[in-house]
A protein has these predicted regions:
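Positively charged, low-complexity intrinsically disordered regions
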Residues: 11-14, 37, 83, 106, ...
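Short, charged beta-turn/beta-strand-edge "cap" motif at the junction between a beta-strand
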Residues: 116-120
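Beta-strand-rich interaction surfaces with strong enrichment in secreted/lumenal proteins
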Residues: 24-28, 35-38, 98-102
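Glycine-rich, low-complexity segments
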Residues: 1-30, 47, 69, 73-88, ...
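Short, functionally important structural connectors and interaction interfaces within domains
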Residues: 6, 32, 38, 93-96
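Beta-rich globular "head" domains
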Residues: 23, 33-69, 110-113, 126-132
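Terminal beta-strand-rich extracellular "head" domains
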Residues: 54-106
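Surface-exposed receptor/substrate recognition regions of extracellular proteins
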Residues: 1-9, 42-45, 63, 98-105, ...
């Protein structure tokens, strides 16, 4: 497993104010909404969304695309900014831009969807949502 130095650097910078939500899927990811949900127990904001895959999915022409939702609405109001992994690839998903909706309040629901996969989704998929408390 690859160590993500971006998480390490944020830990050093944010310290005790950092909260991390994570999920892992060993098998091929499939298109679905609300793959995992978390109830937010603090006021704060989203710092970053990091997605990673160690196993290649299909070999068609589609990227694997992930979306993160806050109370059922995407945090990526610019859809092209969602984390994506080109077909037949592994490693960190690229983001064209950071999420536009980042404010978190006690009781909010944070979730992620798999919006699109190649013929077979990536395997050994990990998502890390890094937040900072106020």
């Amino acid at each position: 497993m690859v160590t993500d130095t971006s998480i390490d650097s944020r830990t050093a910078r944010l310290g005790v104010n950092m909260v991390v939500f994570e999920d892992y899927s060993k098998g091929a990811i499939t298109v679905a909404t609300q793959k995992r949900e978390w109830i937010i127990p603090f006021n704060g904001h989203i710092v970053d969304v990091i997605c990673d895959s160690e196993g290649v999915g299909g070999n068609n022409s589609q990227a694997d695309i992930i979306d993160v939702n806050l109370n059922g609405v995407t945090i990526y109001t610019t859809q092209g900014n969602r984390p994506s992994l080109p077909q037949n690839n592994t490693g960190l998903f690229a983001e064209a831009g950071e999420p536009e909706v980042t404010a978190l309040r006690v009781g909010d629901t944070l979730s992620y969807d798999v919006d699109q996969v190649d013929s077979t989704g990536s395997t050994r998929f990990k998502i890390t949502i890094i937040c900072q408390t106020l």
